[in-house]
Amino acid sequence: MYKPFDLRTIITIIIGCGILTAMFLLIGLVLCLYSKISKALKSPGIAKEADDECYIDPCKDPHESIILANSIPAEACHSYQANTIAVASCGPLQCCNVCGVYADVNSLPPCLCSIREGL
């Protein structure tokens, strides 16, 4: 009345259990990495400081000028008395005639993009 499994059935069960175990392992790995990345982006520490330090929009306050390392002077953009913000760690910002339009919209400098953008 009791008939043992043949060899093919045992091999099929072993392969199926291995695939199922690998799927659970990969799902756990993906969830672990997702939680670590989301915690890193939500933390008020380094990500927020780096975002605030490097994000400067020259068009938000017309009384600010931006002094860049190895770039044109800020007085070339604004001809009036202005507050000064030093941005040495950021890429070069572009001065335009109209404040809301940048010279090359397709490739904005990294200082005008949030580090959380696209995630």
Curated annotation (Swiss-Prot):
Q: Which UniProt keywords apply?
A: Secreted, Signal
Does the entry annotate any disulfide bonds, and if so which pairs? Answer: none
Where in or outside the cell is it found? Secreted
Where does it primarily localize? secreted
Q: Does the keyword Kinase apply?
A: no
Task: Specify the signal sequence span.
Answer: 1-40
Cellular component terms (Gene Ontology)? extracellular region
Q: Does the keyword Iron apply?
A: no
Q: Which family does it belong to?
A: Belongs to the FAM24 family.
Which protein are we looking at? Protein FAM24A-like
Q: Which organism is it from?
A: Mus musculus
